[in-house]
Swiss-Prot record:
The chain crosses the membrane at residues 21-41. PROSITE patterns: ANTENNA_COMP_ALPHA. It holds the Pfam family LHC. Residues 60-69 form a propeptide. Belongs to the antenna complex alpha subunit family. The keyword Magnesium applies. It is a single-pass type II membrane protein. One of its GO terms (biological process) is photosynthesis, light reaction. It comes from Blastochloris viridis. GO terms for molecular function: bacteriochlorophyll binding; electron transporter, transferring electrons within the cyclic electron transport pathway of photosynthesis activity; metal ion binding. One of its GO terms (cellular component) is plasma membrane light-harvesting complex. This is Light-harvesting protein B-1015 alpha chain. InterPro entries: Antenna_a/b, Antenna_alpha, Antenna_alpha_CS, Light-harvesting_complex.
Length: 69
């Protein structure tokens, strides 16, 4: 049965246009990716843009070595 499926699967592309299938797949995956990203941005916990505003500046984390005199 598995051998019959592998040998006959090429017939699907005689019915479906590969260019249309790949274009539709690209559009579908792009829409899904945008929905997921905007969904994450709309939450308080997983919003990576708003999260960075509350963090201290990186300059305050710099350690200055003591002067050796």
């Amino acid at each position: 049965m598995a051998t019959e499926y592998r040998t006959a699967s090429w017939k699907l592309w005689l019915i479906l246009d590969p260019r249309r299938v790949l274009t539709a797949l690209f559009v579908y995956l792009t829409v899904i990716a945008l929905l997921i990203h905007f969904g994450l941005l709309s939450t308080d916990r997983l919003n990576w843009w708003e999260f960075q505003r509350g963090l201290p500046k990186a300059a305050s984390l710099v350690v200055v070595p003591p002067a050796v005199g």
